[in-house]
Amino acid sequence: EDFANLITVVCQTSKGAKTLSGTLFAKNDPRLVRLDEYTFDARPMGHMLFYVNDDKPGIIGRIGTVMGNHRVNIAQMSCGRHEMGGRALTILNVDSEIPPEVIETLLAQDFIAWARQVSL
């Protein structure tokens, strides 16, 4: 990676290690740029949804439909993958807290490996 400044945190859990990296753009614009093997560019703010999905056409639209059906507005989106057709990480910044039933609906989809809401 080519960052002037990069902070990386490694957390050890019972399920293994997780690595998260962040940086500052233009000296005052914080960004998350890596989670494990996925690279992306996401603003760490407000309510966020992190999920890993199959990397194939139509997935983003299906997620948007689920969010829209539950009146959750997507403000920003960032995606990262390491190979075409494999798995992709998507980070959504949303305008409000995501109801638990939305997460349950997403996790019930066969193309979603995992999904977590983060509120900062």
Which residue ranges define each predicted feature?
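A conserved regulatory-domain signal marking ACT and ACT-like small-molecule sensing domains
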Residues: 1-120
